[in-house]
Each structure stands twice: as C-alpha cells, then as structure tokens.
A protein has these predicted regions:
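Parallel beta-helix/beta-solenoid
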Residues: 2, 12, 33, 38, ...
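Short glycine/acidic-rich loop motifs that flank beta-strands on beta-rich extracellular proteins
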Residues: 8-15, 47-53, 60, 81-88, ...
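Short, recurring structural edge motifs at helix starts
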Residues: 21-27, 126-134, 159-162
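Extracellular beta-strand-rich solenoid/capping regions of secreted or surface-exposed proteins
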Residues: 6-39, 48-68, 87-89
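Acidic glycine-/aspartate-rich tracts in secreted/extracellular proteins
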Residues: 4-5, 43
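Conserved donor-binding loop and adjoining core beta-sheet/short helix segment
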Residues: 22, 119-121
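Generic short beta-strand segments
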Residues: 41-47, 78
C-alpha cells in the first residue's frame, strides 16, 4: 500500500475487513490461494463504530485459509472487537513481520483472542468454519518476527487442535509485547 494509506471499517456490523477468496470452493490443503503479499498501510477495525459491540461475538479482521506463501509486513492493525486481528487456517509458509497490533475493546472481560490466530481447517466447535473443505489442514512454516503487540489480550497462538494433526515449524521471535492482558503466546501440539 502507498505510504500513509489507511483503511477504516465504517460498517456498524460485525463483518470481516478482508476475506481471501471464495470460502466455499477452495482447493483444500495448501493449494487454494498462493503468493499473497500485504505490505504496509494502517488497517483500523474501528470497533467504536459497531452498533452492538456489547452483544456476544466480535469480528475477525483478516481471514485466510487453504493458502501458501502469505506475507503480511510493515502494517498497523488497530481497534479490534473481541476477536483476532489476523486468522489463518491451513496456511503453509506465512510470514508476519514488522507489524503493529494495538487496541482492543476495553469492556470485554472474556478476552483471550490472539492478535494472530493459527488454526486448522475444521468446522468442529466452530474453530475455523470459514473455508471449505474441512480437511483438517493445519498451519506449517510460520514466522512471526519483529512485531509490536500493545494493549491487547493475547499476542500469538491457537486454542484448537485436531487428533493426529499438529502445527509444524511455528517460529515467534524478536517481538515486543506491552500491556498484554492474558498471554503473549499459546500454541497447542507443536
């Protein structure tokens, strides 16, 4: 994105900012979407504009599934409502570097949603129902490096797993965490 570009959510609904591709017709595995780069910009999820922010549920900012070679760098993500800034399910070879994640709905006491959520492609218990097929594809070869997490509930992680499937080669290094309300990182079944 051009230097100084700002994208601000203005809808009063709890919808995503960015969903990669068609959620019903993916190739499955890691072959759905490839070679994606998001470089720079400020993405303001603007929870302040949501009409029913005290009602159950929030909204994920970016949702990316069944993909490979995804890079998100040098971007700023602001003002999330009770969910993840970035959510990945079944993604191989992802890099999130040089980003800032800041601001989370302050009145939400049930927090714990990670800024960067690493998931598997399943509809079990509503873990990652956004991308079919539900083939159990996990995330592999993830690098989360040189980011800043400030005034949020949790930095990086997952709170789901599938029997017999594991997340592989997840690297979280050189990040800075300020005023984290719950956990810096949490990943199951590495």
């Amino acid at each position: 994105m051009q230097g100084g570009a700002v994208i601000t959510k203005t809808s009063a609904t709890k919808h995503l900012i960015l969903r990669l591709g068609n959620t019903k017709d993916s190739q499955g595995g890691y072959d759905g979407y490839q070679n994606i780069v998001i470089d720079g910009g400020t993405w303001d999820y603007n929870y302040q504009c949501v009409a029913d922010k005290d009602a159950p549920g929030g909204f994920v900012g970016f949702c990316i599934g069944h993909a490979r070679n995804v890079t998100i760098k040098n971007a700023t993500f602001l003002n999330n409502l009770k969910s993840h800034f970035l959510e990945f399910g079944g993604v191989k070879n992802a890099r999130i570097t040089g980003c800032t994640f800041s601001g989370y709905y302050k009145n939400y006491v049930g927090g714990g949603q990670e800024c960067i959520q690493i998931d598997c492609c399943t509809d079990e218990t509503n873990v990652f129902p956004q991308y079919r097929p539900y083939d159990g594809t996990t995330c592999e070869d993830f690098v989360v490096d040189g980011n800043v997490f400030s005034d949020v509930f949790s930095g990086v992680g997952t709170h789901s797993m599938m029997s017999g499937e594991t997340y592989k080669r997840i690297t979280v290094t050189n990040n800075t965490f300020h005023n984290i309300k719950k956990s810096l990182h949490r990943i199951y079944e590495l």
